[in-house]
């Protein structure tokens, strides 16, 4: 029910936008997860450069512009539930990024297409082993390069290689797939969710959106009758003076939630005003705004 693409070298997102262009033309019977890895932060203002060069991608670029992309090191998950897409951006050194991914079901790879001499860290044995281990049993890959040592390295790390015609002035490129192994099925068919508050409702929604049958149980006769049933809900990030992991997690969580609720519940981000109700809070507000 979900197809996962991994890309080494996300850049400005041209491959993602092209994938999105194709995705919008098809009937979406399953979900798409797109994992993009790059050591540089995606700057939304740079998308105009792509729009000038690739005007046919205008619609897709506008979709990405509308998302609240934070742009920071680490993981960032951008949900587009109406399109059945999750874009997971990982802004880290390539070795750390692949080490931090904890799934092993990536179905297709866009491998770095630049001259391997310019990006040797993208083609080490450790990286290619990680790509193999993170791949599903039927995983495939493509790359713009066709250098002999890259062909051999991919082959030595478990991939079947094929050299095919390239694009434009490029004579050849490489495609391939993971060498066959016994396929294991871990498909979940049906899930019971107990509770219809914010957590239970969100879990049920995401499971159903993944084409999984859901049974919902609650002691009350309607949704969110417990502590989640308040008439008004506010959402805001918990700011910290330290750029530590907890702070990054809270900021990422806020923007993920903002994207999600805007696209599912018509959430209106009206803003909140904090007053310095005591000396401690006044000092905290002053430091945050400095």
Spans of model-derived segments:
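SAM cofactor-binding core of SAM-dependent methyltransferases
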Residues: 3-67
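Class I S-adenosyl-L-methionine
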Residues: 146-187
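Dinucleotide-binding Rossmann-like beta1-alpha1 core, especially the glycine-rich loop
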Residues: 232-290
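A short glycine-rich, Lys/Arg-flanked "PGG" loop and its adjoining helix->strand segment in the class I
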Residues: 124-137
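S-adenosyl-L-methionine
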Residues: 49-101
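N-terminal Rossmann-like FAD-binding beta1-loop-alpha1 element of flavoenzymes
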Residues: 188-215
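Glycine-rich FAD pyrophosphate-binding loop
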Residues: 209-229
């Amino acid at each position: 029910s979900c197809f996962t693409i991994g890309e080494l070298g996300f850049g400005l997102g041209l491959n993602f936008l092209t994938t999105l262009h194709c995705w919008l033309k098809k009937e979406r019977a399953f979900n798409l997860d797109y994992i993009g890895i790059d050591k540089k932060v995606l700057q939304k203002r740079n998308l105009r450069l792509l729009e000038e060069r690739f005007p046919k991608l205008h619609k897709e670029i506008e979709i990405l512009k509308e998302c609240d992309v934070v742009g920071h090191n680490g993981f960032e998950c951008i949900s587009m539930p109406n399109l059945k897409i999750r874009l997971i951006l990982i802004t880290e050194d390539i070795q750390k990024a692949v080490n931090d991914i904890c799934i092993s079901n990536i179905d297709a790879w866009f491998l770095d297409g630049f001259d391997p001499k310019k990006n040797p860290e993208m083609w080490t044995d450790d990286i290619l082993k990680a790509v193999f281990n993170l791949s599903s049993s039927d995983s495939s890959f493509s790359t713009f390069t066709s250098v002999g040592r890259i062909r051999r390295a991919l082959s030595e790390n478990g991939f079947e290689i094929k050299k095919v015609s390239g694009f434009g002035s490029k004579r050849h490129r490489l495609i391939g797939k993971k060498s066959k192994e016994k396929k294991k099925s871990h498909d979940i068919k049906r899930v019971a969710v107990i509770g219809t508050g914010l957590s239970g409702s969100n879990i049920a929604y995401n499971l159903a959106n993944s084409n999984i049958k859901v049974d919902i149980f609650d002691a009350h006769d309607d949704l969110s009758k417990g502590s989640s049933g308040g008439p008004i809900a506010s959402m805001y990030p918990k700011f910290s003076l330290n750029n530590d992991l907890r702070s990054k997690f809270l900021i990422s969580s806020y923007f993920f939630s903002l994207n999600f609720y805007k696209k599912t519940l018509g959430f209106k981000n009206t803003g909140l005003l904090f007053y310095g109700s005591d000396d401690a809070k006044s000092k905290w507000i002053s430091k945050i705004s400095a």
